[in-house]
Amino acid sequence: MFGFEIQPVRSRNWEIEEEEDQEVVSVEIPKPSISFVNDNYKLEFNNNNDTPFNIIVSTNGSPSIFVKGCFESNQFDEIADISYSDIKPLKTTNTNTVLNNKCTVYRHKIEKSMIFITVQYDLPSERCFGFTELVLNTFKNVSQVLVLDKILNTHYLSQNYTHPIPPFTRAIFNSLFKNDYSLTPLESSNIIENLSASFLTICQVKYIPACSILNLYESHLNIESVQSFTPIVKSIYPQLFNNSSLKQEDITSQFKLMINALNKRNDKGMYM
């Protein structure tokens, strides 16, 4: 008589019980720390109750290239660094500071209420809320936050499957931000992540107007994408451009130097 050999099997219930019995090991998320250039800055910001700050946060790549190319050379005072114990800065030349794997905090020399934070390392999503809380707790009296970011960084889920051609920028903002600048909104989002999400969310809770300007991520960056931030930032903070002694050709030259350095690193997979 023919039959099938019965093979012993493992119960799925037993596997579930085994998984439940395993000890869950929690991993502590590294916390950021801020180091001021000198104690005077630390005392000034810790005791400030009068000056409302406008903060511009730029993420790695084209956003930080825009900020550094437009303002860093002669309009910024470096006031602090935001660091993590497991993220090491890299040595770079003066023209390639956009590759230094650091987060530097600047204040505008003339418009002293303007704070710039260039985040030149990639932050995992689980670190973004801690980073945002550190920033907003350091500069307690914040009037508005503007994040310059890339769409890819937000892990934005879209129903629009067309492929826009750069330069391409869209805005996403919390309910407290007044769009008086004709910014083109991104289609209604169902989820965003990382620094744009953390700043928009925490600023909403703290009643701070916040907006994120997003452009495309490009594996080979072009100057048009970097320059696409210019009219937007100029419309929101025109005072930043009124006192600039830099000519447009000088700014463009700075953009090109940093773009070439970034593209060369991406092409060769190495830092300069």
From Swiss-Prot:
A GO-annotated cellular component: endoplasmic reticulum
Biological process per Gene Ontology, one example term: proteasome core complex assembly
Keywords linked to the UniProt accession: Chaperone
Gene Ontology terms for molecular function: proteasome binding
Signal peptide: none
Annotated Pfam families: PAC1
InterPro entries: Proteasome_assmbl_chp_1
Keyword Nuclease: no
Subunit record text: Forms a heterodimer with psmg2.
Cited function: Chaperone protein which promotes assembly of the 20S proteasome as part of a heterodimer with psmg2.
Family under the similarity heading: Belongs to the PSMG1 family.
Name of protein: Proteasome assembly chaperone 1
